[in-house]
């Protein structure tokens, strides 16, 4: 069983990907202001690479942005690549 948890302290946050109870990936972000976040890092344990976990983390941030009516600046190269390839998420890109 997999799950993604979010932690946010209003200045920065993270989405953490768990497989069973083991942390296998993480995406971090910082708040620019009340309307924008910057995704600054995405990382997945190499043993779990190629399963799409990194993309799932970015898409979880997209869902969060839509619910909060905010925009995302994908500074992290991986997140930028996900945004560049997926036209369906451009609505939240700043």
Briefly describe each language-model feature range.
Residues 1-14:
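Active-site rim helix/loop that mediates acceptor-substrate recognition in acyltransferases
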Residues 14-24:
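Conserved beta-hairpin
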Residues 20, 27-36:
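A conserved beta-strand-loop-helix scaffold within acyl/acetyltransferase catalytic domains
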Residues 36-46:
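Conserved acetyl-CoA binding element of GNAT-fold acetyltransferases
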Residues 48, 52-57:
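Conserved acetyl-CoA pyrophosphate-binding loop and the N-cap/start of the following alpha-helix
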Residues 60-94:
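C-terminal structural segments of small proteins and small subunits
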């Amino acid at each position: 069983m997999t799950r993604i948890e979010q932690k946010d302290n209003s200045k920065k946050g993270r989405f953490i990907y768990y497989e069973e109870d083991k942390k296998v990936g993480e995406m971090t972000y910082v708040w620019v202001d009340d309307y924008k976040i910057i995704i600054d890092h995405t990382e997945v344990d190499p043993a779990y690479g190629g399963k799409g976990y990194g993309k799932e983390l970015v898409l979880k941030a997209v869902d969060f942005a839509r619910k909060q009516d905010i925009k995302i600046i994908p500074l992290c190269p991986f997140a930028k690549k996900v945004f560049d390839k997926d036209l369906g998420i451009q609505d939240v890109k700043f």
